[in-house]
């Protein structure tokens, strides 16, 4: 190395890391992705559920044929991610879930997709649904006709909401009794015993309880939310799965709810603080309004 005057410089040491450090740093950054629009463009703008489920045309015969091949699964295919199909498993990732998304983010569509997917892969004697829509019933209107749906509750009938909690408590006790009579430690043990015994034991379908706008319910019926926490705690081993969804999670996600919901999905939120309430990260607050259905999941 020489100076501007041409004089040679010796014993010069570069003020930079060793070559190995660059490789280490690059490998550490490789799995990380930015949050900007250019990164979001790597994902499709929309995905047809029928294409993912491979049931085109969607006939009753095609669904029944799928049931005949198994008809029992806790895996729900929800869309497409960077690495291909994106699915969640109520047992592996749950057993309970928390979902948030502001107006226009695609929350209702996500809930419908969750219910529809599980209906396709489960016979009605393997999984049932109780759907609670605290916005008035629009989100689950089509789902009410599924043979799996055993209850649809809306905010239009407060007494029915209160009765639903009593009924869920009775269902917990019934399941505990049924497992005890079969000497089964949990729902998986019971289902295995039933399969090995030629289905002599009576059916015990998993129960998916989906509540849209639970934040509004928490304000108007706080005792219902307390009851739900009890159901979440006791229902883990009984085959009961709770999905809580809201537009505005602020203040509604209590420590008890957070402790009992391992699976969390955040569509676009109004700000980064609401994103942190759900997935413990700010990212969903930066999702573009031009991308409804885009979400981050904490598994």
Task: Tell what function each PLM region has.
Residues 30-84, 89:
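AAA+ P-loop ATPase motor domain of ring mechanoenzymes
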Residues 49-56, 185-201:
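Amphipathic alpha-helical surface "interface" segments used
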Residues 1-26, 64-186, 199-277, 286-288:
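P-loop NTPase catalytic phosphate-binding loop
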Residues 2-54, 286-299:
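Conserved AAA+ ATPase small/helical "lid" subdomain
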Residues 280:
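Phosphate-coordinating loops and pocket residues in cytosolic domains that bind phosphorylated ligands
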């Amino acid at each position: 190395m020489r100076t501007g005057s041409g004089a040679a410089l010796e014993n010069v040491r570069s003020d930079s890391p060793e070559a190995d450090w660059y490789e280490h740093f690059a490998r550490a950054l490789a799995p990380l992705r930015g949050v900007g629009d250019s990164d979001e463009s790597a994902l499709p703008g929309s995905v047809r559920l029928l294409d993912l489920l491979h049931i085109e045309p969607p006939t009753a015969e095609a669904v029944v044929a799928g049931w005949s091949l198994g008809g029992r699964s806790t895996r729900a295919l929800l869309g497409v991610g960077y690495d291909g199909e994106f699915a969640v498993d109520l047992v592996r990732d749950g057993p309970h879930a928390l979902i948030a998304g502001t107006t226009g983010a695609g929350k209702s569509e996500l809930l419908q997709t969750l219910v529809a997917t599980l209906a396709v892969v489960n016979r009605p004697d393997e999984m049932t649904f109780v759907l609670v829509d605290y916005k008035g019933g629009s989100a689950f209107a089509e789902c009410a006709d599924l043979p799996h749906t055993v209850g649809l509750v809306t905010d239009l009938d407060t007494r029915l909401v209160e009765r639903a909690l009593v009924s869920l408590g009775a269902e917990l006790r019934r399941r505990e009794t049924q497992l005890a009579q079969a000497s089964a430690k949990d729902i998986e043990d019971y289902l295995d015993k039933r399969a090995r015994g030629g289905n002599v034991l009576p059916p015990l379908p998993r129960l998916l309880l989906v509540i849209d706008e639970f934040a509004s319910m928490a304000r108007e019926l706080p005792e219902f939310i307390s009851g739900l926490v009890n159901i979440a705690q006791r229902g883990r081993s009984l085959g009961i799965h709770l999905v809580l969804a809201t537009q505005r999670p602020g203040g509604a996600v209590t420590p008890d709810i957070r402790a009992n919901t391992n699976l969390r999905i955040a569509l676009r939120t109004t700000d980064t603080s609401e994103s942190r309430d759900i997935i413990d990260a700010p990212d969903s607050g930066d999702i573009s309004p031009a991308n409804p259905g885009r979400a981050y999941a904490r598994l």
